[in-house]
Amino acid sequence: MTLNRAFKARGVVVHSVLRDSPVHTRDLAQAGIPYDITKFGGPLDLWTKGRLRKITDKFRPDVVLTFAGRASSYMPRGDYALIGRLGGYYSLKYFKRCDALICNAPDLVRYVVEGGWASDRVFHIPNFPRIEEATPIDRVSLDTPEDVPLALALGRLHPNKALDVLIKAAAIVPNLWVWIAGEGEERQKLENLSRDLGVSDRVRFLGWRTDKAALFDAADLCVYPSRKEPFGNVVVEAWGHGTPLVTTNSTGPSWLVRNGQDGIVTPIDDVDALAKGIVTVLSNRELAAKLVKNGRQRISDEFSEEAIVSQYLDLMEKLRSERKTQCVG
């Protein structure tokens, strides 16, 4: 949705195709972006490819940008440039029809090139955060005192996100309260862990949220303890919303964050180090202000919407022109 909105704001005619999702279709409708629904099912889905052919025949796109494997594998070839966009270490067999690939992190570029793609067909364009003005959410509405140190964590409740490490750190840091915004298969396990460690009264599981800005603005810091993270959207979101960041040296954050300058970086799975990083930020207002200032500067210099969208548009125009020449020839 973030890219769709940004493209539309730059005058691009956008048409989205997606699985049925009430949240996403509502957002598309509110943004005035037309869309179609299809299944993107498994191997027995014989309907989606024909559906996509009908949609492209009607819409006549210059460029098709696909996200993840299934959309790329189902997309029929046409006189448009077909670009796959990778935000993870997906199987490259699904992207064989693509003219080029966009990766949001340098390590994904390495992965794709080592997987056999020509380096001149693989491009690095990072993500940008969607920054919104918001009133900080009332802590009391989420059963949280106003005067306690509060850490915010966002993401799918999955082992890769290492939210168990954050909960263990909360048991070490005196009176630290934690908001966990996200949903996933680890929820029951994480709730049980918080009870076992005696911190369930200080850990709030918020489920999926659409009010990220209000959550960021209410928190004292953002903690992003991932074990495996190719890019790290939460990093740039924390920077964009002016929230001090504590993270780990997983692949994406270790590339993004300059330790001690725009975030605190700790080793993966090191509970004590994560707890120490949290305490350092909470106890040193001067450092916290420095992290916020430098994070905002990184957004302005490297990860602004204007700069990133311009990279997309320039590349799409280049590939569109190449594809048209091939089709005419």
Q: Residue ranges of each PLM-predicted region?
A:
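A conserved nucleotide-sugar
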Residues: G11-H15, L163, I167-R204, S283-A288
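Acidic anion/phosphate-binding donor-loop and adjacent secondary structure
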Residues: W47, V113, S119, F128-D143
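Conserved acidic donor-binding segment of nucleotide-sugar-dependent glycosyltransferases
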Residues: N259-G260, I264-V271, T280-E286
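Aromatic "clamp/platform" in nucleotide-sugar-dependent glycosyltransferases that forms part
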Residues: W208, R227
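A short, well-ordered alpha-helix in the C-terminal region of glycosyltransferases
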Residues: A273, T280, L287-E302, I308-D314
